[in-house]
């Protein structure tokens, strides 16, 4: 039987020498990678303006991506003769984003065209019609909501009969009018609906609550690639 080979331990002859793996490496690109702003922001005092917070505090992760979006909007999109398109996806108008954000941007001239899901433009009409849309909770029991004639969009609560079905009924009456009895694109369809939204706002003593109404007043076309995901298309 062969004897096992003797294992030799490795010893450093000069213990004062630094091991190779501890030697300072040559890092030719290190300076480039470390050329970004040092992360050492000053503490917030409560006196900062929003632009200062975005530029000086939003330094990393999703806050940095938000800062990039803000700077892109400020430095590029607001330049003269720049065409700005807006896309809306997800339940934005039921959450009030139409009233609070989209309408002011349209009124300020910062939107040249919109592409939205059909559902966003449909739910936008509830606001022009002054139908109730309320804050709820994602924890609500959907079965109990159904028994109480309510519908939940995550944590937004909308009455079924008094908002959804009522909007559907009005839409059915509108879409049989002569002006709709022809082939048309989605921009023309929503332009015509926007005219009705303007009138509903006026009758309800409201202003600047509907994206379709604001788009109609500003001449901003509203397209959708998915008209069938709401009553408008169905």
Residue ranges and their predicted role:
Residues 2-165, 169, 174-182, 195-234:
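Metallocofactor- and cofactor-centric catalytic cores in central/energy metabolism, strongly enriched
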């Amino acid at each position: 039987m062969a004897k096992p080979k003797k294992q030799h331990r490795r010893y450093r002859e000069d213990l004062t020498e630094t091991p190779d793996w501890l030697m300072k490496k040559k890092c030719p690109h290190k300076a480039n990678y470390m050329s970004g702003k040092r992360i050492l922001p000053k503490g917030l005092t409560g006196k900062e303006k929003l632009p200062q917070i975005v530029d000086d505090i939003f330094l990393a992760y999703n806050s940095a991506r938000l800062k990039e979006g803000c700077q892109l909007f400020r430095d590029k999109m607001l330049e003269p003769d720049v065409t700005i398109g807006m896309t809306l996806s997800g339940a934005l108008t039921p959450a009030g984003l139409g009233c609070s954000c989209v309408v002011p941007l349209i009124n300020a001239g910062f939107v040249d065209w919109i592409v939205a899901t059909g559902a966003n433009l449909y739910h936008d009409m509830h606001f022009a019609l002054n139908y109730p849309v309320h804050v709820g909770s994602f924890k609500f029991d959907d079965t109990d909501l159904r028994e109480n004639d309510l519908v939940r969009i995550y944590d937004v609560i909308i009455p079924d009969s008094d908002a959804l079905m009522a909007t559907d009924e009005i839409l059915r009456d509108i879409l049989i009018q002569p002006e709709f009895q022809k082939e048309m694109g989605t921009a023309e369809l929503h332009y015509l609906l926007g005219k009705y939204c303007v009138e509903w706002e006026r009758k309800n003593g409201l202003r600047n609550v509907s994206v379709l109404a604001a788009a109609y007043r500003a001449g901003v076309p509203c397209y959708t690639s998915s008209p069938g995901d709401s009553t408008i298309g169905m």
